[in-house]
Amino acid sequence: MRYQNMFETLKKHKKMAFIPFVTLGDPNYELSFEIVKTLIISGVSALELGLAFSDPVADGTTIQASHLRALKHASMAKNFQLLKKIRGYNHDIPIGLLAYANLIFSYGVDGFYAQAKECGVDSVLIADMPLIEKELVIKSAQKHQIKQIFIASPNASSKDLEQVATHSQGYIYTLARSGVTGASHTLENDASAIIKTLKTFSSTPALLGFGISKKEHITNAKGMGADGVICGSALVKIIEENLNNEDAMLEKIKGFVGGMIS
């Protein structure tokens, strides 16, 4: 219900969803919690939280570096502890996890979804799992009332987009471009055709990700028919550039989010 409530409220105010991505435990668990608190206080719509992994193939150098920083002290137990703490801090904000398949399968699919539910997680997106393998997780997701998110990529066929639109719950992660994550100066591709196709199959909101780093990108995304954006690399870069000054880091995150959602 949290995603539904969020999108309904945004629609009422004619606003786009702004969802930040950060890696849990980057640069450490204490500061990671402060970063998430700052994001919530700054007015983000929902959270997309990454689980650190040693080979994050869908990510560019900025987010890869955040995985490596977090991996110095990361564990699944600590990740779940932090998620519980975040949910305890705010009961209403939707929390999504972005994970790589290996982490989930080595933990045990059903156990992972059960634990995610217990921590107050609303959705799971598996970055490197093709749609064809969806049956491996969908039953556990449904059993534990976790919304499974799928990715709509620029080179997907109409049939694939129909599958993505039909099976995605909460929202559809729509790629602004092929390749890996990373902040861009411009949105290279017009995703309006993909979004239009998705909306013929389902009313599930489409969020645009990959390369979102400026206010004008949100305006562009709105023009393409997107219901919101997911912004990762630009935020993670602020963390990377201010590792030695926590106060400055949190202030800059607050300023960045404020500029994006104003």
Curated annotation (Swiss-Prot):
Enzyme Commission code: 4.2.1.20
Domain of life: Bacteria
Record Gene3D superfamilies: Aldolase class I (3.20.20.70)
One Pfam family, short name: Trp_syntA
Signal peptide: none
Catalyzed reactions: (1S,2R)-1-C-(indol-3-yl)glycerol 3-phosphate + L-serine = D-glyceraldehyde 3-phosphate + L-tryptophan + H2O
GO CC annotations on file: cytosol
Residues at the active site: 48, 59
Keywords associated with the record: Amino-acid biosynthesis, Aromatic amino acid biosynthesis, Lyase, Tryptophan biosynthesis
Keyword field contains Ribonucleoprotein: no
InterPro entries given in the database record: Aldolase_TIM, RibuloseP-bd_barrel, Trp_synthase_alpha_AS, Trp_synthase_suA
Keyword Amino-acid biosynthesis among record annotations: yes
GO MF: tryptophan synthase activity
Pathway: Amino-acid biosynthesis; L-tryptophan biosynthesis; L-tryptophan from chorismate: step 5/5
NCBIfam families for this protein: trpA (TIGR00262)
Function: The alpha subunit is responsible for the aldol cleavage of indoleglycerol phosphate to indole and glyceraldehyde 3-phosphate.
Family, per entry: Belongs to the TrpA family.
Quaternary structure and partners: Tetramer of two alpha and two beta chains.
The protein's name: Tryptophan synthase alpha chain
Lineage: Bacteria, Pseudomonadati, Campylobacterota, Epsilonproteobacteria, Campylobacterales
